[in-house]
Amino acid sequence: LFSVIMIDIDYFKRINDTYGHEVGDLVLKFIVDKIRSLIRSSDILVRYGGEEFIIYLPHTTLKDALKLAERIRKGIEDMIIDTEDGKKIRVTISLGVAERDLGETLEQVIKKADEALYRAKKHGRNRVSD
């Protein structure tokens, strides 16, 4: 039994284009630190491309993964990132959640989480979908 959460930073390109890549890197660091503060030591957080992340949640049901995803979404939404030049930046994330069905590979579960993430983005971003 395991679940996967796929995360994408909403409008990350706009952050890089507006504030520069140094601020974009700062945003990534803040998001990673926040996520790490909310997951268990047995959970695995990995970067999956530019502004996408995956969390592997061993021994976690879909219901519990959805609760965690919502806590992460809210935690990021409530965060204010202070840049070195005094700007305050807020970001949101979209999350797709999937649970492994019997016989599915990790790759198949990641694909389901990616499809759920697409639905979250399609329905307005800053939300969790399964």
What are the roles of these predicted feature ranges?
Residues 3, 94:
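Cell-envelope/extracellular polymer assembly enzymes that use nucleotide-activated donors
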Residues 7-23, 35, 39, 52, ...:
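Active-site loop/short helix in cyclic nucleotide turnover domains
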Residues 17, 57-60, 77, 100-101:
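Residue-level recognition of strand-loop junctions within catalytic nucleotide-signaling folds
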Residues 32-33, 64-81, 114:
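Alpha-helical scaffold within the catalytic cores of cyclic-nucleotide enzymes
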Residues 44-47:
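A short pre-motif secondary-structure segment
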Residues 62-70, 99-129:
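Catalytic-core segments of nucleotide cyclases and related cyclic-nucleotide turnover enzymes
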Residues 76-93, 109:
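Catalytic core regions of nucleotide second-messenger enzymes
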